[in-house]
Amino acid sequence: MTDLSPVRRALLSVSDKTGLIELGQALAARGVELLSTGGTAKALRDAGLTVRDVAEVTGFPEMMDGRVKTLHPMVHGGLLALRDNADHVAAMEQHGIAGIDLLVVNLYPFEATVAKGADYDDCIENIDIGGPAMIRAASKNHAFVNVVVDVADYDALLAEMAANDGQTSYAFRQRLAQTAYARTAAYDAAVSNWMADQLALEAPRRRAFAGELKQTLRYGENSHQQAAFYTDGSNRPGVATARQLQGKELSYNNINDTDAAFELVAEFAPENGPACAIIKHANPCGVALGATLSEAYQKAFDCDRTSAFGGIVALNQPLDAETAGKIVEIFTEVVIAPGASDEAIAIFATKKNLRLLLTDGLPDPRQPIVAMKQVAGGLLVQDKDVGHVDLTDLKVVTRKAPTEAQMADLLFAWKVGKHVKSNAIVYVKDGATVGVGAGQMSRLDSANVAAAKAQRMATELGLPESPAKGCAVASDAFFPFADGLLEAAAAGGACVIQPGGSMRDDEVIKAADEAGLAMVFTGMRHFRH
């Protein structure tokens, strides 16, 4: 094997015709013979290029509605033959097989077919067979064959050939082969995962996951860690699918925090009014509803002004000028919203480093999707926590029942608590958080942290007393003892929402009654680690 290998003969068979004509013209200009199939051949011919049909090469027509067209020794022999192996060369000569030096294939759009909600039979028909077979053959023989599966690599191929007088280097072919194997792996993963869904398999014996590189990051959580951002091909609105209008490149921590922020604010449907969430280290500093988006932002910001500095702001409605004007008053890393007015965009333009992401929608907080966490030697796979409760799900367990206004705050606090790292305690007053206790090892400590945050809010805003006085309290899991509940009551809590289910529920309910609290059980836990 020599490092440089010439490209004399190419087979092109693509479903995505983007850039096809330009590629074909460039190859033809270098004297490369073009082979093709079906619609690809027609497109090339319509552009005035000379193309030889694969059916002419194999001596067999395309058959069975196109299911069989390239599955033939004349094709696979041309892809797999080792050019420096005498036996292979002799077999090629004996059977009239000509080498194929370049394969350009992109696969039937199976993923897109599934995404648009096609029926079972239509999805099956969009599973490519010949394409992956050729890709794997060409990739295995990358010592001599180039395989291109991505339109984004067309320019790189032509540049490589231009730099090497119509040849390509071994290192270049290796990189193409790696990309090709990753593509067929991702394709097979999409098919197998779709079939698992069709069969309603909760835990398939084997499961594959795949991603496409979106961004190479400067570093990971810390500067000594390498990192990259991959997308899974879904169209869920969020940081992976957003348009970045301005600002510096997103960092690993920006992406992680922005995802947490937008998933939280999506709990609040825009038709029910404006909502804002401000996030630091994937935990909410403040979350609020408002009569206007500007009011929602101000209330969320007021919850923890200190922590909001350098935070991520997520909005459930398009950013307007009034809200934009408030946001730029302090340092903010990222703002993510479904849209933005021209006036708001102009205001942000004065802050060149502020990242503005627009999504054209909100993620569905009830859409069932898969969540993963890597552990040493394996992956933990579970359904994303899309659990929700409404008024009819709540069970009043104390002598005192919450008022209508308290019920609204309790449900708001419950939605926020779902997105706080456990142990989570959230204090809410009038549709806004006033204290968030996150990530403590005991529920008592989380209640203490939330109370301290509320007291600091009072100091920062010059309030006569803690805003936690008369607040609604949410706990992401049951109170194992009454101490955490009583700490929340001492901070000013007037009503409580929690899952229930502790062996000491009776003791906790008794303590709530004695403290004059109203308490409801949800029957659902929201641990978040």
UniProtKB/Swiss-Prot annotation:
Residue span, MGS-like domain: 2-149
Signal peptide from the UniProt entry: none
Keyword entries, A-Z: Hydrolase, Multifunctional enzyme, Purine biosynthesis, Transferase
EC nos: 2.1.2.3, 3.5.4.10
Pathway participation: Purine metabolism; IMP biosynthesis via de novo pathway; 5-formamido-1-(5-phospho-D-ribosyl)imidazole-4-carboxamide from 5-amino-1-(5-phospho-D-ribosyl)imidazole-4-carboxamide (10-formyl THF route): step 1/1; Purine metabolism; IMP biosynthesis via de novo pathway; IMP from 5-formamido-1-(5-phospho-D-ribosyl)imidazole-4-carboxamide: step 1/1
Any single GO BP term: 'de novo' IMP biosynthetic process
InterPro entries the UniProt entry points to: AICAR_Tfase_dup_dom_sf, Cytidine_deaminase-like, MGS-like_dom, MGS-like_dom_sf, PurH-like
GO MF assignments: IMP cyclohydrolase activity; phosphoribosylaminoimidazolecarboxamide formyltransferase activity
GO cellular component, one term: cytosol
Superkingdom classification of source: Bacteria
Enzymatic reactions: (6R)-10-formyltetrahydrofolate + 5-amino-1-(5-phospho-beta-D-ribosyl)imidazole-4-carboxamide = 5-formamido-1-(5-phospho-D-ribosyl)imidazole-4-carboxamide + (6S)-5,6,7,8-tetrahydrofolate; IMP + H2O = 5-formamido-1-(5-phospho-D-ribosyl)imidazole-4-carboxamide
PANTHER family assigned: BIFUNCTIONAL PURINE BIOSYNTHESIS PROTEIN ATIC (PTHR11692:SF0), BIFUNCTIONAL PURINE BIOSYNTHESIS PROTEIN PURH (PTHR11692)
HAMAP family linked: PurH
Family from the record: Belongs to the PurH family.
Domain notes for this protein: The IMP cyclohydrolase activity resides in the N-terminal region.
Protein name according to UniProt: Bifunctional purine biosynthesis protein PurH
Species for this entry: Ruegeria pomeroyi (strain ATCC 700808 / DSM 15171 / DSS-3) (Silicibacter pomeroyi)
Gene it is expressed from: purH
